[in-house]
């Protein structure tokens, strides 16, 4: 039976429609690939409650993790107005109130839908450690006040506590190595562990304590100085030790107290203050710290006059008297005060007051040790009036830079046992990779290991060329079907 031309056209159009539709279906099902949509972003809020001030940091990371640890970056840094929270002993509620301005700035940055699942934490360091020793109930009242403020915020409050010195040192080490790409780096479109990354040591000088943390060449013989943790699927063993009362503010307080006790008069000649400097202070304010030994016969109502003489040699001698070096005499694995320390090894980043002091003295460009020493001595020998005229608007810390600079040299060279050969291994930095160096980022990296990860959402998708081909065959199928319908319609009318 011979088909009419209408029947032949109708059959051809049906065949084209079937072939085009089948081809389109094959392209969709066979050529499709699984595409991972970008992960949602999570946020975390951390308060660093130091001895002299408090800072807030907001960190962010993808909701999915790399080897059980979040890939964290800094989104905000905010310095809280006022002193450190340990200063609010007479009115603890003000410690909590002081945090509100920075907290509001953080909440404005974080999407409102994320507020209830954003962890917030306050870690207090050496200033509160000292207050806890002096008056534990006052320390608890302050922690309760800041906890009350943060628990009322629309965030997931994880608590406020005093960090151990060892934790502060270890988290600082994590921060330095993370921002330098020693723990994880981005390569060929993915995050990978560095094959042979040289780990960097961390040197932290706060107001009340100082920390040294590094991975030594050999084993750590004193287990009390060893911290182990797991990040991005790798295990780390780090030497770390914190020296309470050896922070910048407390060492200068101790130094002045020693000068007062040795002079036995109400007028003290201070070798670390510039010649021509003079100030009056109360003895009560000097001895208001657990770091300072209080004499039995102290007249708290007496005032003290301090005169600067600008003698860096005598200043160094006085600073050395605050260390117990004899307890480590002849021992290579001992720092000072009888504390075990393996020989320093590798590169180090020095931050906090290490950086602030050397930045003021213009010594952060890795100058040789002899240049550093010469620069500090010459600065110490400048008369006070010349120093004031040379640095307007910096009166708050100006008198202390001489003592701080010389103290850093004594601490690093005679305390931590750096030498002229290893001095070039120290970099004085505030930031690395646009991120502030301190314990907070290391803490957040560790914290993300406790926050559940979210799986990436998968979608079936095609490449652009396959998508275009699919559209062409879809249009061809539609045209063939419409053509067949038209032929059928005209055929029926005939």
Curated annotation (Swiss-Prot):
Its cofactor is Ca(2+); Mg(2+). It is a multi-pass membrane protein. Disulfide bonds join 78-102, 245-291, 328-334, 380-402. Residues 30-465 are extracellular. The active site is at 168 (proton acceptor). It is found in: Cell membrane. GO terms for biological process: nucleoside diphosphate biosynthetic process; nucleoside diphosphate catabolic process; nucleoside monophosphate biosynthetic process. Ca(2+) or Mg(2+). Has lower efficiency with Mg(2+). The chain crosses the membrane at residues 9-29, 466-486. InterPro entries: GDA1_CD39_NTPase. Canalicular ectonucleoside NTPDase responsible for the main hepatic NTPDase activity. Ectonucleoside NTPDases catalyze the hydrolysis of gamma- and beta-phosphate residues of nucleotides, playing a central role in concentration of extracellular nucleotides. Has activity toward ATP, ADP, UTP and UDP, but not toward AMP. The transmembranous domains are involved in regulation of enzyme activity. This is Ectonucleoside triphosphate diphosphohydrolase 8. It comes from Rattus norvegicus. The gene is Entpd8.
């Amino acid at each position: 039976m011979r088909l009419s031309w209408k029947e032949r056209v109708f059959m051809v159009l049906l065949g084209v429609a079937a072939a085009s539709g089948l081809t389109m279906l094959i392209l969709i099902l066979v050529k499709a690939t699984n595409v991972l949509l970008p992960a949602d972003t999570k946020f975390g809020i951390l308060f660093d409650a130091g001895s002299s001030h408090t800072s807030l940091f907001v960190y962010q990371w993808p909701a999915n993790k790399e080897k059980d640890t979040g890939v964290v970056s800094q989104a905000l840094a905010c310095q809280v107005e006022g002193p450190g929270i340990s200063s609010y002993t007479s009115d603890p509620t003000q410690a909590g109130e002081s945090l509100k301005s920075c907290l509001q700035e953080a909440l404005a940055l974080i999407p409102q839908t994320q507020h209830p699942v954003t962890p917030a934490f306050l870690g207090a360091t050496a200033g509160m450690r000292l207050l806890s020793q002096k008056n534990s109930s006052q320390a608890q009242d302050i922690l309760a006040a800041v906890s009350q403020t943060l628990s009322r915020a629309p965030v997931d409050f994880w608590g406020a506590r005093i960090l151990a010195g060892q934790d502060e040192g270890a988290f600082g080490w994590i921060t330095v190595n993370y921002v330098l790409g020693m723990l994880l780096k981005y390569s060929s479109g993915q995050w990978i562990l560095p094959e042979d990354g040289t780990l960097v040591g961390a040197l932290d000088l706060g107001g009340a304590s100082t920390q040294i943390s590094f991975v030594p060449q050999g084993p750590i013989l004193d287990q009390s100085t060893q911290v182990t943790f797991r990040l991005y699927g790798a295990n780390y063993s780090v030497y770390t030790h914190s020296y309470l009362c050896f922070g910048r503010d407390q060492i200068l307080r101790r130094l002045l107290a020693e000068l007062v006790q040795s002079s036995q008069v109400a007028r003290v000649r201070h070798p670390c203050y510039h010649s021509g400097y003079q100030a009056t202070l109360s003895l009560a304010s000097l001895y208001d710290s657990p770091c300072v030994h209080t004499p039995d016969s102290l007249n708290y109502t007496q005032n003290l006059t301090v005169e600067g003489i600008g003698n860096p040699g005598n200043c160094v001698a006085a600073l050395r008297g605050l260390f117990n070096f004899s307890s480590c005499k002849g021992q290579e694995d001992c720092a000072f005060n009888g504390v075990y320390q393996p020989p320093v090894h590798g590169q180090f980043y020095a931050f906090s007051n290490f950086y602030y002091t050397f930045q003021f003295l213009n010594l952060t460009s890795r100058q040789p040790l002899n240049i550093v020493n010469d620069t500090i001595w010459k600065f110490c020998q400048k008369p006070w009036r010349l120093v004031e005229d040379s640095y307007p608007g910096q009166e708050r810390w100006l008198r202390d830079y001489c003592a701080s600079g010389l103290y850093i040299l004594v601490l690093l060279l005679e305390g931590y046992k750096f030498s002229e050969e290893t001095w070039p291994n120290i970099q004085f930095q505030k930031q690395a990779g646009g991120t502030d160096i301190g314990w907070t980022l290391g803490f957040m990296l560790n914290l993300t290991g406790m926050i559940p990860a979210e799986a990436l959402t998968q979608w079936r998708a095609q490449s652009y060329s396959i998508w275009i081909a699919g559209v062409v065959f879809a249009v061809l199928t539609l045209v063939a079907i419409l053509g067949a319908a038209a032929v059928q319609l005209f055929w029926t009318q005939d």
